[in-house]
Design a protein with these regions (language model features):
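Short acidic, low-complexity intrinsically disordered linear motifs used
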Residues: 1-17
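Core of folded catalytic or high-affinity ligand/protein-binding domains
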Residues: 71-150
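Glycine-rich short-loop/terminal segments
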Residues: 14-107
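Compositionally biased, intrinsically disordered low-complexity regions enriched in proline and serine
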Residues: 12, 30, 38, 120-122, ...
Length: 150
């Protein structure tokens, strides 16, 4: 399983989001990803050490982001779309992060919320990605390049 994930990571990092819209492009890709996600085990013991290795990275990156914007954890979904998120940061210097639907098998709630802040800042603000499949895949690719190698 670890070798499969390593090879997948190499592929995804080199993937340039060149799929075309339509039933044999993005739609099919999203369908395949959703099917793979649905078939995957909810918990994989072999992933625990990788998530544990990410915790110092999460703390470090979160501190950097806090130095740039006021991160506020909220018990709601504060933004309808990525444009609203970017406008809030631009106009108010505030990045609201939802703590709803945030259960994680390995990260504690605080670490998971910090990781969400990193995701939103690095992806939706710095890379200008949307809250759609293409934007989230681009976000995932960006995250992979910054994660610790373990």
């Amino acid at each position: 399983m670890k070798e499969i994930l390593t090879e997948w990571r190499k592929f995804v990092m080199s993937e340039k989001l060149m799929l075309k819209p339509g039933p044999n492009g993005w739609d099919k890709y999203c369908e395949l990803v959703a099917e793979a996600y649905a078939r995957a085990p909810k918990f994989d013991e072999s992933a625990v050490s990788s998530f544990e290795a990410m915790k110092p990275f999460v703390d470090k990156m979160f501190k950097r982001i806090e130095g740039v914007v006021d991160v506020q954890f909220v018990e709601e979904h504060p933004y309808e779309n990525a444009q609203e998120l970017r406008q809030d940061v631009k106009n108010n210097g505030v990045l609201k992060i939802s703590t709803l639907d945030a259960e994680h098998d390995i990260f504690d709630p605080e670490t998971n919320a910090k990781f969400r802040a990193i995701h939103d800042y690095m992806s939706h603000i710095q890379r200008n990605t949307e809250f759609d499949a293409k934007g989230e895949i681009a976000s995932y690719n960006a995250h992979l390049q910054t994660m610790p190698p373990k």
